[in-house]
Amino acid sequence: MIIAIPQLNYKAGDIQGNSEKIISAIQKAQNQKAELILFPELAVSGALPQDLLEREEFVNACRMAVEKIAATCTQIAAIVGAPNLDSENGIMYNSAYFIQHGEVVDGVHKNILSDYDIFSESRYFIAGEDNTPIRYKNQNIRILFDEYESEYIDKTDSFVIFIGMTPFTVDSSREKRKVLATLAQKYNKNLIAVNHVGSYTSVLFDGNSMVYNYKGKKACQLNEFAEDFQLIDTNKLGTPTLQSPVSQDRIALLHKALVFGIRDYFEKNGFQKAILGLSGGIDSAVVAALAAEALGAQNVMGLLMPSCYSTEHSVQDALALAENIGMPHETIAIKAIYEQYLEALHPLFKDQPFNVAEENLQARTRGMLV
């Protein structure tokens, strides 16, 4: 079976924009004669919609978007992740819709909800109670959300698709490769894992959608921190021939993630410029370098705010950094403002020895100005 794997950068709450991306990928896949196209968990709503899921009009809009997407699937089948409200019973599932012949014909619900870190799915969703394979072109397609549902894999399954979204950590790609290789060998099945790519405020998705053959060998890996589109043939996965992205060391990977996350966050929120304080220290230097790489040095303003505690060396280091990066910079002396704070607080501080409380007023002053 020819399967299209689009790896897309969705936006939380942007149902129309996400749907347009999905439809565009479907049209591309149909033009390339793909038989099935895969989209991850909550592709229509965007990852982490959170309290938007408490608004019935939002969930209904997601359902209408799924129907609009289905209408474009005239020559291809699709698996699309979206919230699914059972209005009759007043419950909602995290579902994978199966689309064929221009309409939704089947689907599965996520059975093991994620409730860790930033995930609180049981607050919004009800867990599904079973998992039945999708029947398509005389093949049984098992749709799972993550490896915790692997107990549903059956010997009659033709291949397995994981549509769960995997947040980025420095070790997430390595761990995912290990898990998929182990499961592929254990169950003797070809496995496909499709992921989100993009930033969601405090969470980053790195893409890295993967395909493993039944021998536990990686057959395909999509790009990290970038949209991508790949076609695979499940009949030709026995001997992997597809090129995969070159792995990087941890520092290089973290650097790439930070630059991508900053750039994507600014783009999604309509920001173009940033103002950063430059102290001459390593912390502000690293932040400035990352911001300049992500946004362009001309879009990052460096603000030097020396005080009576600033050394000439730190001021010169901050100036050298700004000039080396090529970023515009300004200097605002904060001594006068700092002294006004001290004067205002003197009635409270007069009987106390001078300590870090007074020194830290300079940090508060800088924060106010930035």
Q: Locations of the language-model features?
A:
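Enzyme catalytic cores with a strong preference for nitrogen-chemistry domains
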Residues: M1-G277, L290-A297, L304, N324, ...
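A generic structural signal for residues located within well-ordered alpha-helices
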Residues: G17, R250, A357, L361-T365
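Acidic active-site catalytic centers that drive phospho-/nucleotidyl reactions
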Residues: E41, S279-D283, R366
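A conserved beta-strand->alpha-helix junction
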Residues: I112, A226-D233, N299-L304, E312-N355, ...
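Conserved glycosyltransferase catalytic-site signature
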Residues: R177, R364-G367
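A glycine-rich phosphate-binding loop feature that marks nucleotide/adenosyl-phosphate handling sites
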Residues: F271-S284, I337-Y338
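Short glycine/serine/threonine-rich phosphate/pyrophosphate-binding segments
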Residues: S284-V287, T311-E312
